[in-house]
A protein has these predicted regions:
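A short, N-terminal "cap"/entry segment at the start of jelly-roll beta-barrel domains
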Residues: 1-39, 120-175, 179-180, 283-291
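Short, low-complexity cationic-aromatic patches
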Residues: 35-38, 52-63, 79-80, 95-103, ...
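A structural feature that tracks compact, well-ordered secondary-structure segments
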Residues: 45-47, 73, 110-111, 178-182, ...
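A short beta-strand-loop-beta hairpin characteristic of the jelly-roll/cupin
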Residues: 49-87, 202-233
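Conserved metal-binding segment of the jelly-roll/cupin
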Residues: 82-103, 110-113, 228-251, 258-262
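Double-stranded beta-helix
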Residues: 102-162, 173, 206-237, 248-291
């Protein structure tokens, strides 16, 4: 029998080490698949660069780098790209990238090499151009959404990062999906589920933020007998496919999170099957395809 995607979290301590390096967030042993892999289709990594140069390489169709710390530049796909904390970079096939920083930097790096390894194929065609999503623009858009009296009440207060090459899926690449999300202080973002695996990265938070994950809902539309993942800035955790999950902020400050999924592929295959719970409170709870 094929094993399920496990619950697993990854400590942010790697981002404090004194030397450059790459840490694959590998659960391939639990998945019983050729490694390394964080989900059947994706591999997430922590990357640390200390005053110098580091090369990354992946036999993948899509790579996403989120700049968690620092500033510098990257040479990839025949281009030199300047980056700073909070920026997002995506690169297509031809997986080598050379990163430079004069100080200290950290990336959250996700790519789809495990999917290609399973299929026994290599990426031969660039499906999109190297793209940078600047933090300042994403943050301004997120603030606009959070300030609007209508959109601020949405199930998720977030900016969906999308590439114009993929107008049907509206995703950051043809396989990857990424969202720059806000979890406002004192708020609960109610349960929803989807058939893509989420590799969540906590950008910033204070103690008191967490995600509840589980397979069932109670009569009030909240997660029944859930597994709790406490947030910590720079940490990552896995949300298994098909599991309900809700986000909670019991701290006194806003928090930010970056879920990355294989939902670009699922959306194209029409297998995402996203559902939202609408808890009861003063009325009967229900589930729908609308947030």
């Amino acid at each position: 029998m094929i094993p399920p995607v496990p619950y697993h979290s990854f400590s942010p301590d790697f981002f404090q080490q004194k030397t450059s390096g790459i840490l694959p967030l590998d659960v391939s042993r639990q998945l019983k698949c050729p490694g390394p892999a964080t989900s059947p289709a994706l591999l997430a990594n922590f990357v640390r660069i200390v005053k110098g140069t580091l090369k990354t390489n992946a036999l993948a169709t899509s790579q996403l780098f989120f700049v968690f710390q620092g500033a510098g530049r990257t040479e990839a796909c025949g281009r030199t790209i300047e980056w700073k904390e909070g920026d997002f970079m995506v690169f297509p096939a031809h997986g080598e990238a050379i990163h430079h920083t004069e100080g200290e930097a950290g990336f959250y790096w996700v790519h789809d090499a495990p999917l290609l390894r399973y299929l026994g194929v290599t990426a031969t065609e660039e499906r999109f151009h190297p793209t940078v999503f600047e933090h300042s623009k994403a943050a301004a858009k997120l603030q606009q959404i959070a300030s609007d009296p209508v959109t601020s009440q949405a199930n998720r207060v977030s900016v969906l990062l999308a590439n114009s090459n993929f107008p049907q899926t509206r995703t950051i690449t043809h396989t990857l999906w990424a969202m720059f999300g806000l979890l406002p202080k004192g708020k609960v973002q109610y349960p929803h589920r989807h058939e893509s695996v989420a590799l969540d990265f906590v950008i910033s938070c204070k103690p008191g933020c967490y995600t509840m994950i589980g397979t069932e809902l109670d009569s009030d539309g909240m997660i029944k007998n859930g597994h709790r993942e406490n947030w910590k800035s720079g940490a990552s955790f896995i949300t298994p496919a098909g599991y309900w999950h809700s986000h909670h902020n019991e701290s006194g400050e806003d928090a930010h999170v970056l879920p990355i999924q294989d939902a670009g592929l699922h959306t194209y295959l029409r297998t995402l099957d996203i559902l939202y719970s609408h808890p009861g409170h003063d009325k009967t709870s229900y589930i729908s395809q609308r947030p």
